[in-house]
Amino acid sequence: MGRGEFLAMKTEENAANLINSDMNEFVAAAKKLVKDVGMLGGVGFGTSVLQWAASIFAIYLLILDRTNWKTKMLTTLLVPYIFFTLPSVIFQFFSGDFGKWIALIAIIVRLFFPKEFPEWLEIPVALILIVVVSPSLIAWTLRESWVGAVICLVIACYLFHEHIKASGGFKNSFTQKNGISNTIGIVALLVYPVWTIFFHIF
């Protein structure tokens, strides 16, 4: 074998090695990309599920406080919590004409027929009014950011503290027949903001 043939074979071997190395790196990068996309998709799905759950539990607590199981919990704080956790599709629906009609009818009834306006409707109507009149900075920017999650976390922590105090201690809040329903609901309120803040930081 001549020197020229040896050099040609060596060059082809080096080229093949480089191609194989590049292919291996490409495959590894593709696998990492698929893994990262899957993780992000999982996080996004988990966030959406927890957001729905947070809204449902907040509404549940709002209804529960209007029944015979009334507590000393400040349920008006659930209004801003629901505002910040309400899923976008529902928020957009109520911020449109449907919500405006409800707000208009409620205001007219409240002004001209105050005795006919039920007390239990005041908080839901207040929530719809806030959704309708909130500026875009609050309605879309803050709601979708970590700021909204921090506000929800502060509200949930305060409600949990007040509920424990009203129940006569941490143990009683989990053992009393009426208190445990509120306790489970309030603990559920903590999950979504903690999850959201964690993934905003990390």
Curated annotation (Swiss-Prot):
One of its GO terms (cellular component) is plasma membrane. Induction: Repressed by sucrose, glucose and fructose. Slightly induced by turanose and mannitol. It is found in: Cell membrane. Residues 64-72, 119, 167-181 are cytoplasmic. Its main location: membrane. Pfam families: WCOR413. Keywords: Cell membrane, Membrane, Transmembrane, Transmembrane helix. One of its GO terms (biological process) is response to glucose. The chain crosses the membrane at residues 43-63, 73-93, 98-118, 120-140, 146-166, 182-202. It comes from the Eukaryota. InterPro entries: COR413. It is a multi-pass membrane protein. Residues 1-42, 94-97, 141-145 are extracellular. Belongs to the Cold-regulated 413 protein family. This is Cold-regulated 413 plasma membrane protein 4. It comes from Arabidopsis thaliana (Mouse-ear cress).
